[in-house]
Amino acid sequence: MSIILLTFIFGLAIAIERIIYLNLATTNTEKLLQKIEDAYKSGGADAAKEVCRNTRGPVASIFYQGLDRISEGIDVVEKSVISYGSVQMGLLEQGLSWISLFIAIAPMLGFLGTVIGMIQAFDAIQLAGDVSPQLVAGGIKVALITTLFGLIVAIILQLFYNYILSKIDSIVIKMEDASISLIDMLVEHGIKK
């Protein structure tokens, strides 16, 4: 049962870290786009890059990469934004495979506890030489408790996992939408091939 508890602690720690990271990665993209456009109008690409540099989050990082390649034309900017968007998406999804692993192994560890509990019950019956309800009940109790604990851990971690996935999806949709808006803004301001 202590192994299941460790699984829960590690899974919960990773989930909490991801939630904090994702909350810090969330940016008001409309406001950022407006700041970048204003900076671009007044000071060019360098001023717009400075706005991105001073803003946290994946959207600002993607914008910075695109603006950094602005002298090479809009096609290169677009490819840079798409490529770096994939990098940022990987950073957002970091650690999810561990949470998924803990979700999968927690019930298995619980079932392992069930088997161990049943073996202990049969050992107790064998040593006593007769079948007593108290001997069987002790082993079955251990079996049921470990199974229950494994299932509870998996359910809790699954809830966190699904919340994190929905948060990542929301950020990715905003990244994609904002990237299109950045490209449109640059085309509007005369950036050509």
Where are these regions (language model features)?
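Transmembrane alpha-helical segments in integral membrane proteins
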Residues: 10-18, 153-164
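Residue-level signal for the membrane-embedded core of alpha-helical transmembrane segments
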Residues: 3-10, 103-109, 113-116, 147, ...
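Hydrophobic alpha-helical transmembrane segments and adjacent short intramembrane/lumenal linkers
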Residues: 129-144
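N-terminal membrane-entry
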Residues: 1-4, 93-100, 145-146
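Hydrophobic alpha-helical transmembrane segments of polytopic membrane proteins
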Residues: 141-159
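Predominantly long cytosolic amphipathic alpha-helical stalk/bundle segments
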Residues: 26-112, 116-130, 159-193
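Hydrophobic membrane-targeting segments
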Residues: 1-31
